[in-house]
Amino acid sequence: MELMPNRSLNGLYMFLDCIFLVLLAFYFVKTKRYVPLLVGVLGGLLYFLADYGGFYLLLGTRKVVGANPFWFLLWLSMSYGFTNMVWMWLWFAEPENRLEFSLLIIVWWFSVAVISNGAGAAFPVISIERGTGGYHWIMAVFLFIGYAILIFKNLQTKQPTERMPLLSILAIGLLVQFAWEAVLLITGIRSAGIRTLIVDSLMETNLGAPYLYLIYAALSKPKEVA
């Protein structure tokens, strides 16, 4: 199943997004949210390993035009890897603040896209694309295994407090990818259509949600997640 997700954005987008990421990291330090900060940084590095090391160097499916691939993909990975992982972790750890953190990230993604489209004409344009046929099936394997682990845990447990919050995990797994895919499509940064939005939303970030929840549950006493 070959899809070609693509983006075309300018340097102003990158500049503004770097400021946002620094401010968000500073907020986490100020409020002593050190674990989400660490999870975000590790998530960004994991994304970079997959994108630059896997898609660009190993598979050759990632194309970058208008920027140095290493530095551009480092920013791209830290941007989405950091926000995606932070958002999911806080969804599990702070259910009372789900709306606030969700709005913060979604509104930022939309705002920076519109601002850079309107005010970034003087900045260089970077275009990227990525073929998915060579690895989406691998993602599907991890997607199934992750959710199968949670499902069988629920089928085997007799204690309500030990059940995995499947609906909540699925909700954030779908929401994260769908939110930024939709923003990219609506604002014209991504020209790929609805099929790419749906498949990527079902597949990509969602495959990591079960594993991240298992890590969260192992490291902390989970709050009741609805």
Regions found by a protein language model. Name each.
Residues 1-226:
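Aromatic-rich, lipid-facing transmembrane alpha helices and their immediate juxtamembrane interface loops
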